[in-house]
Amino acid sequence: MSRFFANGSDSESESSEDEIQATNFNKASAFQFSDDEEEVKRVVRSTKEKRYENLTSIIKTIRNHKKIKDIPNTLSSFEDLTRAYQKALPVISKEENGITPRFYIRCLAELEDFINEVWEDREGRKNLSKNNSKSLGTLRQKVRKYIKDFEDDLSRFREAPDQESEAEDEVVALESDGGDAGDDSDSGVKPTEAAPKAVKTAPAKAAPADDDDSDDSIDWDSDSESETESSDDENQYQNMRERFLKRTTEKEEKDDDKRKDKRKEQKIKIRKRAEDDEDGEWETVVKGHVVEKPKMFEKDAEIDVPLVLAKLLEIMSARGKKRTDRRLQIDLLFELRDISDQHNLGTAVSVKIHFNIISAIYDYNQKISEPMKLEHWALLLEVMQSMMKLLLANADIIMSESVAEEHEEYVTAPFYVRGCPLAAVERLDDEFVKLLKECDPHSNDYVSRLKDEVNVVKTIELVLQYFERSGTNNERCRIYLRKIEHLYYKFDPEVLKKKRGEVPATTSTSVDVMDKLCKFIYAKDDTDRIRTRAILAHIYHHAMHDNWFQARDLVLMSHLQDNIDAADPATRILYNRMMANLGLCAFRQENVKDAHHCLVDLMVTGKPKELLAQGLLPQRQHERSAEQEKIEKQRQMPFHMHINLELLECVYLVSAMLLEIPYIAAHEFDARRRMISKTFYQQLRSSERQSLVGPPESMREHVVAAAKAMRCGNWQACANFIVNKKMNTKVWDLFYESDRVREMLTKFIKEESLRTYLFTYSNVYTSISIPSLAQMYELPVPKVHSIISKMIINEELMASLDDPSETVVMHRSEPSRLQALAMQFVDKVTNLVDVNEKVFDMKQGNFFQRGNMGNRGDRGYNRNQNNQGGNWLGQRRDRNNRNRNQRGHHKNNQDRQQQQQQQVQTIDEE
């Protein structure tokens, strides 16, 4: 009979009891039976248990992959996890009222932290393989997109990450059962999986292993329990042989007891943890013995200045030692400051403790190249400002590094404290720059850190006020330079309004502040570096506010370009930034030639990004070592101080176009013409070599297309390529007064197109009407007259002006196109002949010019001669032959030149 029908009813189960017993064989028997006869112990689990077990197994896999940083497998496991969670959603909605299980939120939070940690490690990311790097980007995007639906749950989890929910208790129970099952499998007995307890229900007693047989036989009647109790011996032993075999029920019972004990222990742990959470926060236990926090003073000790100073010296004596707890050191100093304030030990003692707190915060980060933590940064700003306010409020406190420790005074005024607030604020400024460099410039973190510049500048102002009251000239120059470096690159619109008279003349602007600070440094500084940096920053600030002549005069009078190569790298970077901004200023002030001269050194190298310290270009393997790359990264400028490289390149190319195109037209047939801009010339030539040129898309293509239009004298097409919607968005709208710049560009394009047109087509015209030229290029007649007059005066255009008729009369002094080509051809042929003769002489040598003409028979005679005097007769013969050959070659050259002149005259006559 089928096993399914064996327990159909009470009567059937009673009548077929023998048949059922015949199938209840133990797996541990000595004989193997078929699958139909072998007993299989099973547990009927709910859908929730199955789904949760699937989720926990995938989460375990993800954690294992994270440990070994196997990112591709982490990505595939994450995709499996999302699919498994989607399948479990109906169960979660029913059982958990739609609340996401906490263990799932924990997995998402851990995965997000892991991705952020790997992503922020830029050095480690470079060493990743191509597959890992690609998988990391994909995983980051998918996780960021996926966790948007769990933002509230994640935020609640991060507030209390150590709290565990009932669902996590179930997961722990599942994991413990899985571990026990592994133990049972070793003993040869197939384990029975215990079902975890349901959420929010009382724990039920674990059923014995033998009771599960009713589930295996699928006996659905409730009376089966009584039947099994009445026939214990018959159900336990199926045949006579099995009565005398070794019993396995004792071991199974022990295993069940073990499972029960483990579950009880787990519940007790969870209960204790919940009680501890109610009592207070967790404390991290240090490996080894627990280090107690040292007591500051004895209970009955009298707190006075010597005692506090001795305690301060004791705390700071551990500074820099190997096993010093730097966090504890900072906490002790803060506690000592509070004790000092409570007992009114004086402002001088408080200032001393403040300064030591600042030193301890700086010491916390052992690697000076890495930025400090944000919590320490906020603490540093607060302590620094507090110390400077105390110094400014008490004029009788003198704090200087020149004060010796034995001469410090804390009891009677004037108070002397050893310390250097200038060095502290300089380190503060450097740490601020490190924090900015560490952040992603396109993220909100960078904006948040940039807001701290207000507090940094405020701190610098406090230090500046203190040293203006009591400080040496050198100290004042150093703090002035720090303020200048936070001011020189910032644009002040009040400066231009003051120029136009829109604000009162007494209004103080950033230019006035820069003048005051820089002039003091020019007069009082005794170090070249501070003065040089102040001049460069001063020029940069003038150029930013269109003070072209002041900036140019400072450059010329300081002779910076002569000795800048001997400066340090940071000063050379500032010099490059100054030249770039000076070029932009010259361009805005219609000085195209000066703009080109300022930018040519930067752009001709092809590495303006590196020269301006705005990023590193990818190098070949051995061109830059890891140490050099690290040093260059430390020299990079923060993102908010960058100069737009596309704007810089566009200004350079447009300036080169306005200079180069008229020059090319004027020297079209000159074989020895020089290039004004090598970069622009290469761009133009590469475009001309292309067989098919489409419409321009990039900024460079727009400039090249405009140059081609200008060569034909078509100013309208040239202006449309330079000034259009796309170029306005990319380049011209970045200027302060963009409309004025666009008008200036259009005017220059008209003028240079006119000059190009006259150079190109002067041999076609006999005379040209000036009013028609003015109408063609939409320029005033006086302006056209002025342009042509300059060309005639500079001997660029061979023509004369006829004022009564307002025409330009062309003089045919230039060779025609055919004549120019013929002369060009003759020059090239001449050069070719000279080169061939030189090559022939190099290959032949002077073998046939020797005295013996290559005859080897005289070697014995020469060998017998006195070698001290040498073969003077042969040497004289060789010298005479060489002179004769040189005279013949010179005569041949003269004859060749005469023939060329005759050919040119013949061509002219024809």
Curated annotation (Swiss-Prot):
Biased composition annotated in UniProt, kind: Low complexity: 188-207, 862-874, 895-910
Keyword Isomerase: no
Keyword Protein biosynthesis among record annotations: yes
Composition-biased stretches (Basic and acidic residues): 240-268
Residue stretches making up the PCI domain: 639-815
Record's keyword terms, sorted: Cytoplasm, Initiation factor, Phosphoprotein, Protein biosynthesis
Compartment(s) of residence: Cytoplasm
Phosphoserine modified-residue sites: 34, 165, 176, 185
Source domain of life: Eukaryota
Comp. bias (Acidic residues): 11-20, 162-186, 209-235
Biased composition (Basic residues): 882-891
Pfam families (alphabetical): eIF-3c_N, PCI
Coiled coil ranges: none
GO BP of this protein: formation of cytoplasmic translation initiation complex
Annotated GO MF terms: RNA binding; translation initiation factor activity; translation initiation factor binding
InterPro entries xrefs: EIF3C, EIF3C_N_dom, PCI_dom, WH_DNA-bd_sf
UniProt-annotated stretches for the region Disordered: 1-21, 157-279, 847-910
GO CC, one annotated term: eukaryotic 43S preinitiation complex
Subunit structure: Component of the eukaryotic translation initiation factor 3 (eIF-3) complex. The eIF-3 complex interacts with pix.
The family this protein is said to belong to: Belongs to the eIF-3 subunit C family.
Function according to Swiss-Prot or TrEMBL: Component of the eukaryotic translation initiation factor 3 (eIF-3) complex, which is involved in protein synthesis of a specialized repertoire of mRNAs and, together with other initiation factors, stimulates binding of mRNA and methionyl-tRNAi to the 40S ribosome. The eIF-3 complex specifically targets and initiates translation of a subset of mRNAs involved in cell proliferation.
Identification of the protein by name: Eukaryotic translation initiation factor 3 subunit C
